[in-house]
């Protein structure tokens, strides 16, 4: 898998992702080793205690008002399609839902239930752009299904012709 073709929150494509900013994050799987007095050189049993997780981090660099509102909450100023500003939220905001990441290599990662944590960051200079620094906290879906999966992209026009034929359910 390689290359980000599109990132969506629900049905909304959230804009350009800064080159080199995507990191899967998360944690490695955890286990407990069981040792025996009679076996000094290795554990006699390893018990898995937690699966590996992902917690992607990335930076959005296409800062139109709709993208800002999509990941930070708050209020858009103006009329639909002709927004003239954005106001920060006045109350605690939790934005959760389905995320999809289409890869250039021909796969799509679907996260049915993730909470976005984001802030305005970066630098305000003529050589860099401001950005929305984002982290997805992947949560268990309410229906008990997998927290994320990776499959061949349904709309192959978004991916390159080098897509892999097999899908991976995680």
Question: What kind of feature is each model-predicted range?
Answer:
Residues 63-88:
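Charged, amphipathic alpha-helical segments
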Residues 108-170:
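Mixed-charge, glycine-accented linear interaction segment located at domain edges/termini
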